Each structure stands twice: as C-alpha cells, then as structure tokens.
Amino acid sequence: MQLNPSEISELIKSRISELGVDSQVRNEGTVISVTDGICRVHGLSGVMQGEMLEFPNNTIGLALNLERDSVGAVVLGEYTHIKEGDPVKCTGRILEVPVGPELLGRVVSVLGQPIDGKGPINTKLTDFIEKVAPGVIARQSVSQPVQTGLKAIDAMVPIGRGQRELIIGDRQTGKTAVAVDAIINQKGKGVYCVYVAIGQKASTIANVVRKLTENGAIDYTIVVAASASESAAMQYLSAYAGCTMGEYFRDRGEDALIVYDDLTKQAVAYRQISLLLRRPPGREAYPGDVFYLHSRLLERAARVNAEYVEKFTNGAVKGKTGSLTALPIIETQAGDVSAFVPTNVISITDGQIFLETDLFNAGVRPAINAGISVSRVGGTAQTKVIKKLSGGIRTDLAQYRELAAFAQFASDLDEATRKQLERGRRVTELCKQAQYKPLQVWEMAASLYAVNNGFFDDLEVKNVLAFEKGLQDHLKSKYADLVARIEATKDLSKDDEAALRAAVEDYKRSASF
C-alpha cells in the first residue's frame, strides 16, 4: 500500500483543527504555609502589590509582601479550609467595594455586604478601596461650617466642610458620643454621613445604630462595621472602605462626613498583620509605614473645587464643590498624647478636640479641654452669628482653669480675680450639654449672647442650665420671628441684637427659672 504524504499531512491538519484546545496563560502559585490568616504562596511571579488573589472555595486574599521566592498574602475571611499545596490564582484586579446612595440607611460589612437583615443592596457602581487623594490644584479652601450642635465645639473649635478634626481622649470620655451627636445634627442639612466602627464590640455598634435610628439619622448614614470578632485584615481595610463610600458623594458635588471609630484599633490591626508578615518592627512594635497608613487615609478628606467635580462627572454637575469631612477618633492611655499613633494623627489632622477624664468625672460633658483643643481652620468656617458671639468664651475658660488652679492656694483674692472665677464657673456650666440633644444655631446664639452680656453673672451656678432652657422656650413661644430670622440668615444684625437683648431682659424679669 502506497502512502501519499500530502494526504497524511491533510489528515493530521484536520485532526488538529478538530481538537479545539484553548490554551490559557494563567499566573498561578501554590500555598506553602497558612498561619493566623497569613498565607505564604510560592510562584505568582507577576503579582502586583495589593492585588486580589483567588484561593479555593472563592476565598479572596490580598498580596501585601512581594519577596524574591514567595508572596505574603492576607486572607479576607475564613482561612481554615486552606491547606499547603492548594492552588492560588492572580485576578489582575484591585479590591473594590460597592458605592452609591443605595447604601444609605444600611449597616454593611467591610466589603459592602449587608449585615442588618434588611435584604440585599442593589448598588450600580463599585470603586477602588485604595485611591490617591485629590491634588493641591483640585482643592478649595474650607469656608463652610459643619455644625455639630455642641456649644463647646461650635463656639471654640469650629469644624469646616472638608476639614480633618481629631477627637482624642482616654477610654470612656465620650469620644463616640461627640461623633454621634455630630451625625445626628446633620439632619436636613444635606450632609451624608459614614460611621466606620473598627474593632468595637458588636453590642456597642448595635447601640450606636439604635441611637441613630431613634433620632432619624440612619436615613442619611452608612454604617461600616468591622467588629472585634472580625479578622485583623478586615479591621485594617474598614477605614479605606468607608472612605471610598464617602468619596462617592464628595466627587459628585455633595457634602459628606465620615467618622473613624477608632484609628488606634486600626493601627493595632495593621501592626498585627505586619508582624505576622515578618516586617521589621519599629517604635512600640509598629511597622515603619504606620504614619503613611493614616496619612493616605486622612488626606482623602478634602473640599474639592467645582472644576474637579465637573471633570469627574463629565459635565453633569456644574458649579458645585464637594467635600468629605473626617472625624478620626484616637484613644489614649492615661492621657498620653505623646505616644506614637496619637502624635502621628495630631500632625496629620487640622486640629484636635481633646477630651479629659477629670472633666468627664466632674460632670462637664462633653469633657472638652478648651486650653489644648484647637481647630486650625478656625473662624473662616464658622457661622457668622456664632463667630460674632463666641470670641470671649475660649479665653474666659482658659483663664478660669489657670486661676482656679492658683486660687486653691490663695486665701484672699481681689475682686477682679473673684469675678473672673465666678464667670468661668458659669461659662463651664453653660458648656455642659445632654447627649443626643444637639442645638440649633439660634439656640446657641441666644445662650452665647446671654453669657457674653452678663445675664448669667447674678445667677447661681446650678440654675444656669435651667435659665438657658427657659430662655429657649421663651424665645420660641414669644419671639418666633426673631428665631426664624437668626436661623435663616445665620447672622445677628443690629436690630436683631437689640430685639434679642430685649427678649432676654424680658425673660429675666419674669424670673420663671
């Protein structure tokens, strides 16, 4: 039998074409070890820093350490089923979370999954968890206020839209209470809020959610929860996830407020991951890049100009600036603000509200130390009427604290010193405020006006808050036009000032407090 070479080659070609083998090039590696949520993977030569990795059972990991012969990855979620020899694939993607108005009113995990039992969230968009902060040219100076509704803050340490204001203090000094009050006070002001709970007890988070719901604040708030039972990786990523959700509003010409509660626990989680990845420890065993951990997060809070918003939205939104205001919380140990993480965050932020244990225990709540609490944005972002009336409050309080310490040792005090001490006691009393009871601008203005003009000087200290409450009720019932004008203009004209003085004098004569 004679074989024709051309027939043989044709036969081989047809067989090859029928095979239909698809060749896929894939970057794949093998698990060498897995301990405490950290996987060492051999291979993956083309992996990128921060890239998502796919483990068996659709488990996701994050490549953090790129070494010569292995990759150190942190597993997001359950890792007990991963074993030595398991295959690991590169995804070529960076971690993303869902964003959009659909998240408002919901409690979500770090990766944007609903955990409040209210059904699925149908978001249309996702965005990267790590993003570069807006540049200098894209920013606009901070000039609009974020009213917290707390007299002590709005009068002495005003916060502006796009500012980063640190809330710092020991445990149990009311840090979360200040932040939650600020969120509650944004009702009807067009500010969307994000509350990021990092490493807290689940019961504490549930309590915050309940309070927000009771006060009607949950409708414009996203709660991102990474409780103490979550892995260190989730606690570390939670702040960035919340920031991305807040940036959605900022970049579209809206105003947003984000609370990180608290960044000390985030730094501890990052330290845990870094030590498990065998990175060299530095001061207090934190890794060398713990400053960058917080600076790249807090720099994303900014006020962006109208050009940036217009360019981002492809011309859909014109003439509107956007802002993301950050209220990071730091917990200190025995008032030590010179520890590593507190000093880092103080140097990054635009001011700090310092809460003191001694003041808290003395019944001054919020327990704000007026002497060392500052806002580096200052009066530029303050409401006109509050700016006009709050000038003397801070100095009165600072001088009072100084004199009070001195007066303990002095037996006979001159008249001027005694007057200053008496005034200081009344101003301190006036700065006290009940939790979840933020004040409107006109209420604050009335209180500040009364204390500045000496209407409290002849009252007993214990009657100060009762007088304030009575004055507010009196103004609301008999001077509704004046109240409406102050609230609308956020200013105090000469005529309104005269009317306010007459109203306060009228109330004081009635002596119904």
From Swiss-Prot:
The record marks 373 as: Required for activity. It is found in: Cell inner membrane. CDD domains: ATP-synt_F1_alpha_C (cd18113), ATP-synt_F1_alpha_N (cd18116), F1-ATPase_alpha_CD (cd01132). It is a peripheral membrane protein. InterPro entries: ATP_synth_asu-like_sf, ATP_synth_asu_C, ATP_synth_asu_C_sf, ATP_synth_F1_a_nt-bd_dom, ATP_synth_F1_asu, ATPase_a/bsu_AS, ATPase_F1/V1/A1_a/bsu_N, ATPase_F1/V1/A1_a/bsu_N_sf. It comes from the Bacteria. ATP binds at residues 169-176. Keywords: ATP synthesis, ATP-binding, Cell inner membrane, Cell membrane, CF(1), Hydrogen ion transport, Ion transport, Membrane, Nucleotide-binding, Translocase, Transport. Signal peptide: none annotated. Its EC number is 7.1.2.2. GO terms for cellular component: plasma membrane; proton-transporting ATP synthase complex. It catalyses: ATP + H2O + 4 H(+)(in) = ADP + phosphate + 5 H(+)(out). GO terms for molecular function: ADP binding; ATP binding; proton-transporting ATP synthase activity, rotational mechanism. Transmembrane segments: none annotated. It is an enzyme of class 7 (translocase). Belongs to the ATPase alpha/beta chains family. F-type ATPases have 2 components, CF(1) - the catalytic core - and CF(0) - the membrane proton channel. CF(1) has five subunits: alpha(3), beta(3), gamma(1), delta(1), epsilon(1). CF(0) has three main subunits: a(1), b(2) and c(9-12). The alpha and beta chains form an alternating ring which encloses part of the gamma chain. CF(1) is attached to CF(0) by a central stalk formed by the gamma and epsilon chains, while a peripheral stalk is formed by the delta and b chains. Produces ATP from ADP in the presence of a proton gradient across the membrane. The alpha chain is a regulatory subunit. PANTHER family: ATP SYNTHASE SUBUNIT ALPHA, MITOCHONDRIAL (PTHR48082:SF2). This is ATP synthase subunit alpha. It comes from Polynucleobacter necessarius subsp. necessarius (strain STIR1).
